Amino acid sequence: MATVKISLSLASLSPSSSSSSIQSKLSPSFIPNAAPAKAVKLRFNGKSLRAKPMVYRSSRSVGVTCSASSSLTTLPSALLFDCDGVLVDTEKDGHRISFNDTFKERDLNVTWDVDLYGELLKIGGGKERMTAYFNKVGWPEKAPKDEAERKEFIAGLHKQKTELFMVLIEKKLLPLRPGVAKLVDQALTNGVKVAVCSTSNEKAVSAIVSCLLGPERAEKIKIFAGDVVPKKKPDPAIYNLAAETLGVDPSKCVVVEDSAIGLAAAKAAGMTCIVTKSGYTADEDFENADAVFDCIGDPPEERFDLAFCGSLLRKQFVS
C-alpha cells in the first residue's frame, strides 16, 4: 500500500481570509498510520477555525479546507517534545563535539567519530553512554579503579561537557529545526500543555528552550530532563512523570520523538507518537510510530501541525 505524508497548514492564513476561502495545500510524500479525522477546532488571530484533515493512502496530492466554526472537538491535552534531534539536531555537531573537546581537555586520548557516536546514541543518557563505552574498550589510565569513584569521574566529565555544549547553544550556533516554534505556538495558543522530556542534562535542555525558543515561550514550557527519573529511555519513566505532573491522561498526549528508543518510551507510556527523523536516526525502525516525517516543517514546506496531532488521537479513540 502506497503511503503519503500530509500537512495541515494554518500558518499561512491571514485574519482577513474569509471562512469560505481559507484553504491550504497538503504536501504528500508519506502518510502516517491514520484514518480520516473529524474537524479540529483551533484559534488563529482571534478567529475560530475548523480544520478537516483528510488522510489518504495514496501518492496523489490532497487538500484541506479550514473554515470558521464553533464546533467543538478534542485537541491533545499535552504536546511532549524530546529535545536532542527534535527541537535541535544537536548530536553530530553539538553533543559529540562537546564530548570530544572534554576528552581532549582531560587528556584522555579518546575521540568519538561520527559513526561511533551514532552507535552510542542507542544508549540513553550521556553519563550512561560514557560508562558503557569505557566498560567495553577499557577505562582511561586517569580514571579511578573504584566503582563509586568512577561514577564521580563520569559525572565530572559530563558536567564539563554540558558547559561546553551550553556555549554552543548560547551562541546560537545550533538552530531550531523547521516548524518547532510554529507547533509550540499553536499548542500554547490553544491551551495545550507543552513540555520537553529528555535524557539530556537539565541545564542543557533549559538552555536550548530558553535561548532558541525565547524566554516568553520558555516560561510556559515544563522541562523533564536528566536524572529526574532513575531510568532513561526506552523506559517510559520520564513520560509517565510528565503526564502525572501535568495532570493529563497519557492517552491524550502526543509525543514528538526522533529515535527508536524515544518512540519505545512514548508507546510504553501509552501515548501517541510522531517521529521526525534526525541526522542519526533516519534509518532506524519506526514501525510502531503513529506517523513519521523528516521534520515538522514551516510553510510552505510544512509537514504537519496541531490539527494533525488531534486527528491521530481521534483515530486512536475510534479504532
UniProtKB/Swiss-Prot annotation:
Keyword Transit peptide found: yes
Swiss-Prot/TrEMBL keywords: Chloroplast, Hydrolase, Magnesium, Metal-binding, Plastid, Transit peptide
GO cellular component terms attached to this protein's record: chloroplast; chloroplast envelope; chloroplast stroma; cytosol
Effect annotated for changing Y117A: 40% to 80% decreased catalytic activity with xylulose-1,5-bisphosphate, but no effect on activity with ribulose-1,5-bisphosphate
E.C. number(s) listed in UniProt: 3.1.3.-
UniProt transit peptide range: 1-65
Pfam families: Hydrolase (PF00702)
Coiled coil: none
Protein residues bound to Mg(2+): D82, D84, D258
Annotated catalytic residues: D82 (nucleophile), D84 (proton donor)
Impact after mutating K161A: 40% to 80% decreased catalytic activity with xylulose-1,5-bisphosphate, but no effect on activity with ribulose-1,5-bisphosphate
Effect on the protein of changing H95A: 40% to 80% decreased catalytic activity with xylulose-1,5-bisphosphate, but no effect on activity with ribulose-1,5-bisphosphate
Sequence positions that bind substrate: 82, 91, 125-129, 158-161, 198-204
Gene Ontology MF terms in the entry: hydrolase activity; metal ion binding
CDD domains assigned: HAD_CbbY-like
Subcellular locations according to the entry: Plastid, Chloroplast
Effect of D84N: Loss of catalytic activity
Annotated catalysed reactions: D-xylulose 1,5-bisphosphate + H2O = D-xylulose 5-phosphate + phosphate
Domain of life: Eukaryota
Residue ranges of the TM segments: none
InterPro entries, A to Z: CbbY-like, HAD-like_sf, HAD-SF_hydro_IA, HAD_sf, PGP-like_dom2
Entries under NCBIfam families matching the protein: HAD-SF-IA-v3
PANTHER family tied to this protein: CBBY-LIKE PROTEIN (PTHR42896:SF2), XYLULOSE-1,5-BISPHOSPHATE (XUBP) PHOSPHATASE (PTHR42896)
Function: Highly selective xylulose-1,5-bisphosphate (XuBP) phosphatase. Also shows activity towards ribulose-1,5-bisphosphate (RuBP) and fructose-1,6-bisphosphate (FBP), but not towards fructose-6-phosphate (F6P) or ribulose-5-phosphate (Ru5P). Degrades xylulose-1,5-bisphosphate, a potent inhibitor of rubisco produced by the rubisco itself.
Family of this protein: Belongs to the HAD-like hydrolase superfamily. DOG/GPP family.
Protein name, per record: CBBY-like protein
Gene source species: Arabidopsis thaliana (Mouse-ear cress)
Record gene name: CBBY
